[in-house]
Amino acid sequence: MARTVFCEYLKQEAEGLDFQLYPGELGKRIFDSISKQAWSEWIKKQTMLVNEKKLSMMNAEHRKLLETEMVNFLFEGKEVQIEGYVPVEQK
């Protein structure tokens, strides 16, 4: 049976992550209070950020920026702003 959490992002009970995906205390907080669906939405935003801003995970400043954006997105309800990104019109 899948574990459920009260997802802070979705503001409802949802299927939790299978294991801790991020290290440290922040990783424990994510595991305890973020759903698979919310994490999946974050991964899409993270990919866009890395690609559009040409971030390198070898750069500590870039990793810190991503972590800040992740906390803002998952826990504070702030949308990720990606300069120059224009969504494709859906038909």
UniProtKB/Swiss-Prot annotation:
Keyword Iron: yes
GO molecular function: iron ion binding
SUPFAM superfamilies: YggX-like
Domain of life assignment: Bacteria
S-S pairs: none
Pfam (any one): Iron_traffic
Single GO biological process annotation from the record: cellular response to oxidative stress
GO CC list: cytosol
InterPro entries for the chain: Fe_traffick_prot_YggX, Fe_traffick_prot_YggX_sf
Keyword set, alphabetical order: Iron
NCBIfam families: PRK05408.1 (NF003817)
Stated role: Could be a mediator in iron transactions between iron acquisition and iron-requiring processes, such as synthesis and/or repair of Fe-S clusters in biosynthetic enzymes.
Family: Belongs to the Fe(2+)-trafficking protein family.
Protein name according to UniProt: Probable Fe(2+)-trafficking protein
Naturally occurring in which organism (per UniProt): Actinobacillus pleuropneumoniae serotype 5b (strain L20)
